[in-house]
Regions:
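GST-like domain detector, emphasizing the conserved glutathione-binding G-site
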Residues: 1-64, 74-76, 82, 189, ...
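Short, hydrophobic secondary-structure boundary micro-motifs
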Residues: 20-23, 108-110, 159
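GST-like fold's C-terminal all-alpha helical module
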Residues: 36-152
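Histidine- and/or cysteine-centered catalytic micro-motif in compact active-site loops
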Residues: 111, 122, 163-166, 200
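Short gly/pro-enriched beta-turn/loop segments at secondary-structure junctions
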Residues: 112-114, 189-192
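Mixed-charge, Lys/Arg-rich low-complexity intrinsically disordered regions
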Residues: 155-191
Length: 246
């Protein structure tokens, strides 16, 4: 499953309680989470990774780590925002979030939903990973209090799982049956066609495979990998571009 937006949908299906998408807030929580993933995240990263923040973030890492990171971001084709512009935007977004959490414990009520988690992670990065830049948060104490409530949710239980372990599991497993959802054709590309899917806003590398599902919300490609065997790769429709393979 590619993209956290789709992964959240899958988690909601596997574990419906507690809800990520409250029934009366499904639309607005998705829209807010999409804004946080793109706009808020972009402003926060551009703010945090200006020279002072980048120097602190990469301090103590092996020589060449910062340059490798810059080259990786450049290859992804992400647009660079001037630090002053990012700072102004980030401050504005923090004030907007403060307005929301002054009325409720969480963004849309008494319990956190997908919107809270989407908004929290770039702010968490500012506070925990680049603390030399975290002074921007002090102007919005309501946001800091909300962040404390989010942190109190805990981190769950993590287990180390290497890339090779994941490949081994995939090689020994079969793809799950596809959901019984209607084929929604927006491109004039029939099922069974060789296609590529590419992220709309970052990362130029296409994923190629056979289109085996195109529902209202996602695409599924069948691929055969020499190491992982037969796999199904799922993408959300929003944010990804479907094309016939050349």
């Amino acid at each position: 499953y590619c993209d956290t937006a789709l992964i959240c949908d899958v988690l909601e299906h596997l574990q419906p309680e507690p809800v990520l998408y409250p029934p009366h807030l499904k639309g607005v929580s998705r829209v807010f989470a999409q804004w946080a993933d793109m706009v808020l995240f972009g402003a926060a990263m551009a703010y945090c990774l200006q020279p002072r923040g980048a120097q602190a973030l990469f301090a103590g890492l092996p020589d060449g780590a910062a340059e490798a990171f810059r080259n990786d971001r450049r290859a992804m084709g992400t647009a660079r925002t001037h630090p002053a512009d990012a700072t102004a935007a980030y401050r504005s977004y923090l004030r907007r979030i403060a307005n929301m959490v002054e009325e409720h414990d969480f963004l849309f009520g008494a319990e956190p939903c997908v919107a809270d988690f989407a908004a929290y992670h770039p702010l968490w990065f500012t506070r925990e990973c680049v603390p030399v830049m975290a002074d921007i948060l002090s102007a919005t104490p309501a946001v800091l209090e909300w962040m404390d409530r989010m942190a109190a949710q805990g981190q769950g239980r993590a287990e180390k799982f290497s890339a090779q372990d994941a490949v081994t599991v995939a090689a020994g497993a079969l793809p799950q049956p596809l959901p019984a959802e209607a084929f929604q054709d927006e491109h004039g590309i029939p099922l069974g066609s060789r296609v590529t899917i590419t992220a709309e806003s970052f990362g130029p590398e296409p994923t190629e495979g056979t289109l085996i599902a195109a529902t209202r919300t996602r695409y599924t490609l069948a691929r055969t990998d020499p190491r992982a065997g037969d796999v199904h790769v799922h993408f959300p429709r929003v944010g990804y571009v479907l094309r016939r393979a050349a």
